[in-house]
A protein has these predicted regions:
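N-terminal beta-strand motif that seeds the catalytic metal site of vicinal oxygen chelate
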Residues: 1-19, 63-65, 114-119
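Catalytic core of tubulin tyrosine ligase-like
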Residues: 22
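Conserved short beta-strand elements that form part of the metal-binding/catalytic scaffold
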Residues: 28-62, 108-113
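Vicinal oxygen chelate
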Residues: 10, 31-34, 76-119
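Short beta-strand micro-motifs in enzyme catalytic cores
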Residues: 6, 39-41, 63, 95-99
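Mid-chain, well-packed structural core segment of small domains
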Residues: 58-87
């Protein structure tokens, strides 16, 4: 459903420490990466909602929330029309597309469109 929160990322300077913190706090079972060669530690927190701890130099900048959309191209255009910024969509092969965005106040978020044919 468009606008539903489907994923979030926790940027971490030390992914081991962050995984231990969030796993310990909520009992989340944080696993290894689903993508070879990329340290992206995924977990599920509820029905259909997942997250990941990922290494980042921007640790401390806040959690990135991903919002579902049925048409990522139209959503990117709408973000720009409303005064936000949006990068071009990027593929997550065999999973879907995402676009990194900011709202009019500079708050980061991302758009997501599932697509098993993304490449």
């Amino acid at each position: 459903m468009a606008g539903e929160i489907v994923h979030f990322e926790v940027p971490a300077a030390d992914p081991d420490r962050a995984s231990g913190f969030w796993g310990g706090l909520f009992g989340w079972k944080i696993g290894g990466s689903a993508m070879e060669g990329f340290d992206y530690r995924m977990f599920q927190v509820g029905e259909g909602l997942g997250g990941a701890v990922m290494p980042s130099e921007k640790a401390g900048s806040g959690v990135i929330i991903y919002y579902d959309t049925d048409d990522i191209d139209a959503a990117v255009a709408k973000v720009r029309e409303l005064g936000g910024t949006a990068d071009e969509k990027q593929p997550v092969p065999t999973h879907g597309w995402f676009a990194a965005c900011t709202d009019t106040e500079g708050n980061p978020f991302s758009l997501w469109q599932g697509d098993s044919n993304a490449a």
